């Protein structure tokens, strides 16, 4: 497998997620923290205007702007579309990138704990995910892609890499424990890559648990699009926990319970994520699987 020569640590893809932004600032002030012997690491603040205004984005979600067709479009670009083109020129181009690995740092208001999000099943991504989960037993691995549909996340610029997602944390703030937990995952990842480049890694052959994205679920709404129910208290904060048929899912404003009614159990994630209200997403449903790496 090809060695990694250039790695990017990206923060602030969403301008109100301060953990990644201030880690990038820290690494820029103390570059020795991310320096390794056999590959080059660079940092990037992805959405500086969003950060300045403490907004997730100015015009559109930057982490949905990396479709090849959009990157090649030069007509009337908004701010995030222009940033996506700049980032693609810096790290990419998508499909033939200058960088070999992208670490994209995120936070969530949902109770996701420590999560890494994979946008493909590249063998190297599975190996590093397996190693990280062995070092951090509470780490969850969420696979969020459809092999038949082009992924538009910043991580899709190159095959190797993943997003680190930590929570719960409010938008626009820092929280020391999650800051240092994120930094620890970054450091462990860099050490793993250094050892990989040196050929010093033991062969990894074990089962890991992944949470495979199935679909998103919207809030119950009127025909005019008004929300009429909230996440049920029994489900709130239970990300990565099993939701079985017949269990409470939503609670209406007149105190009526709406139950999960599909045939098979699921494991919801991003439950009640603040940034997803505008997207019509109350939660994402996943299937818990064990795979051999």
From Swiss-Prot:
GO terms for cellular component: cytosol. This is Probable aspartoacylase. Keywords: Hydrolase, Metal-binding, Zinc. GO terms for molecular function: aspartoacylase activity; hydrolase activity, acting on ester bonds; zinc ion binding. Substrate binds at residues 56, 63-64, 165, 276. Its EC number is 3.5.1.15. NCBIfam families: PRK02259.1 (NF002601). It comes from the Bacteria. It catalyses: an N-acyl-L-aspartate + H2O = a carboxylate + L-aspartate. Zn(2+) binds at residues 14, 17, 106. Its cofactor is Zn(2+).
């Amino acid at each position: 497998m090809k060695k990694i020569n250039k790695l990017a640590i990206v923060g602030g893809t969403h301008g109100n997620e301060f953990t990644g932004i201030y880690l990038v600032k820290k690494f820029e002030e103390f570059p020795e923290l991310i320096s390794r012997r056999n590959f080059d690491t660079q940092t990037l603040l992805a959405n500086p205007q969003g950060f300045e205004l403490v907004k997730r984005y100015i015009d559109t979600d930057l982490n949905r702007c990396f479709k090849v067709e959009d990157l090649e479009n030069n007509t009337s670009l908004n701010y995030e579309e222009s940033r996506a083109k700049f980032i693609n020129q810096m790290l990419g181009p998508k499909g033939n990138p200058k960088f070999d690995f992208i670490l994209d740092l995120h936070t969530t208001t949902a109770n996701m704990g420590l999560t890494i999000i994979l946008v493909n099943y590249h063998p190297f991504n599975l190996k590093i995910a397996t190693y990280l989960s062995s070092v951090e037993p509470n780490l969850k691995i969420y696979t969020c892609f459809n092999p038949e549909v082009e992924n538009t996340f910043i991580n899709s610029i190159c095959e190797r890499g993943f997003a680190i997602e930590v929570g719960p944390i409010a938008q626009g703030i820092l929280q020391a424990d999650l800051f240092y937990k994120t930094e620890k995952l970054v450091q462990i990842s860099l050490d793993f890559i250094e050892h990989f480049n040196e050929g010093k890694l033991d062969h990894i052959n074990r089962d890991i648990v992944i949470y495979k994205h199935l679909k998103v679920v919207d809030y119950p709404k009127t025909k005019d699009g008004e929300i009429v129910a909230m996440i049920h208290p029994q489900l709130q904060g239970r990300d990565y926990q099993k939701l079985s048929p017949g269990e409470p899912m939503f609670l209406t404003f007149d105190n009526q319970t709406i139950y999960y009614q599909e045939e098979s159990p699921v494991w919801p994630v991003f439950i009640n994520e603040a940034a997803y209200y505008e997207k019509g997403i109350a939660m994402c449903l996943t299937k818990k699987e064990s795979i051999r790496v």
